[in-house]
Curated annotation (Swiss-Prot):
Location in or out of the cell: Mitochondrion
Gene: GEP5
InterPro entries from the UniProt entry: Gep5 (IPR031455)
Protein's name according to its UniProt entry: Genetic interactor of prohibitin 5, mitochondrial
GO biological process: mitochondrial genome maintenance
Family: Belongs to the GEP5 family.
Length: 277
């Protein structure tokens, strides 16, 4: 909802949006969300103000990304299920004791943490939907072991894809290990249970934010729209602007075949990354 004070500013904000060197489809979507959300209106107004002040196109790129990669880009079905069953997944999140490395003959090949750090696909084969002993017993169990395992595989397949394609990640950063690693105290025993519970909560929150917000897959509809803008816009500057804004695009290849998110998704870099302008 838009507050009454901000509602008075919407016409002026709409005029500012229409004056930006953005494609008309982007302008339409921005205006729609500004009319219906005070928070989004403020974000758009801030980016417009910074662009007008500095004449820096990175603020236009930010508007394109907010529009086509977040606000008008729905979560794929498996991420909606991640959101729906977040607390239950926290109770079953994969983990590894750091002390277990001491008993391994070759931790580099046996440790789940090392397999993830080294980007080894073997890490995906060891996922199990098993309730750990730090679980919150007040959470109602709704997923069967098969459903939970499938959902974990969907989540971790997206994570593995991003880890294997660091250039597509937000800020081109290396992403952390997605499992919980339970550390040791200096004396060699495990840390307190309350701290371990917080590790599970933080880890699932970090993975959710990384997959759903910082690096959300682009819908095939939006990939097609952005592809048309990049190839058919009248000015080269607009084509280049949209291609820069889409430099981290990737999609779920079996998106339309699984509306309920019951299959493990497959991913590929966006075709718009390869388009010549």
């Amino acid at each position: 909802m838009v507050s009454s004070n901000l509602q008075e500013l919407i016409p002026a904000l709409s005029r500012s949006i229409r004056q930006l060197p953005l494609h008309i489809e982007t302008q339409k979507v921005l205006e729609f969300y500004c009319r219906n959300s005070s928070y989004k209106s403020l974000l758009v107004a801030q980016d417009i103000s910074e662009f007008e002040k500095h004449n820096d196109h990175k603020y236009l790129e930010a508007l394109i990304q907010k529009t086509h990669f977040l606000w008008d880009n729905p979560l794929p079905p498996f991420l909606k299920r991640f959101q729906l069953y977040h607390k239950e997944l926290t109770n079953h999140w994969p983990y590894e004791y750091q002390r277990s490395l001491l008993s391994m003959s070759n931790p580099r090949k046996e440790s789940q943490g090392y397999l993830w750090r080294d980007g080894k696909e073997l890490a995906l084969s060891n996922l199990r939907f098993e309730k750990h002993r730090w679980a919150d017993e007040n959470i109602i169990e709704r997923l069967s072991p098969e459903q939970g395992t499938q959902l974990l595989h969907s989540i971790f397949h997206q994570y593995f894809f991003l880890k294997s394609h660091a250039r597509l990640c937000y800020n081109n950063r290396k992403i952390p290990v997605p499992i919980v690693e339970i550390p040791l105290r200096p004396m060699g025993n495990d840390v307190a249970d309350c701290r371990i519970r917080n590790l599970f909560k933080r880890k699932t929150a970090v993975v959710w934010n990384l997959l759903a917000w910082e690096n959300r897959p682009l819908s095939t509809r939006n990939e097609q729209l952005l592809g048309e803008i990049i190839t058919k816009s009248e000015t080269r500057s607009m084509r280049r602007l949209y291609q820069r804004a889409s430099r981290r695009a990737y999609v779920v290849t079996n998106e339309g075949k699984d509306p309920n998110g019951l299959q493990v998704p497959e991913f590929r870099p966006g075709e718009i990354l390869q388009m010549s302008i």
